[in-house]
Design a protein with these regions (language model features):
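N-terminal core-binding DNA-recognition domain of tyrosine recombinases/integrases
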Residues: 6-21, 27-103
Length: 103
């Protein structure tokens, strides 16, 4: 997993006191995000992904027959990660913001 994602998870654990189950779910979702970044460009990182690339990643999850609730949870984790990056000044805008969760 990319070090920046590990930092995010560490802050979730310490500052928000997230439960082990929450952290496990976020870790899986951020692992998917990291894999998506590596598929786009080798040695890339999740903070470099665009809205279009994230949308493709969600479509891949749908094609893998993930339940809509699982895809929505994944998108929620991605959004939280990008909000965190924006607050830190690591990105100019949140590429996950315009994405809609499946119903």
């Amino acid at each position: 997993m990319h070090p920046i994602a590990e930092q995010f998870l560490s802050e979730l654990a310490i500052q928000r006191r997230a439960s082990r189950h929450t952290l496990d779910a976020y870790r899986r979702d951020l692992f998917r995000l990291n894999q998506l970044a590596l598929e786009v460009t080798p040695n890339s990182s999740p903070d470099k992904l665009t809205t279009t690339q994230l949308r493709r990643g969600l479509m891949q999850l749908h094609a893998q027959n993930l339940a809509p609730r699982s895809i929505a949870r994944t998108l929620s984790a991605w959004r939280s990660f990008y909000v965190w990056l924006a607050r830190r000044g690591a990105i100019a805008h949140n590429p996950a913001e315009p994405l809609k969760a499946p119903k």
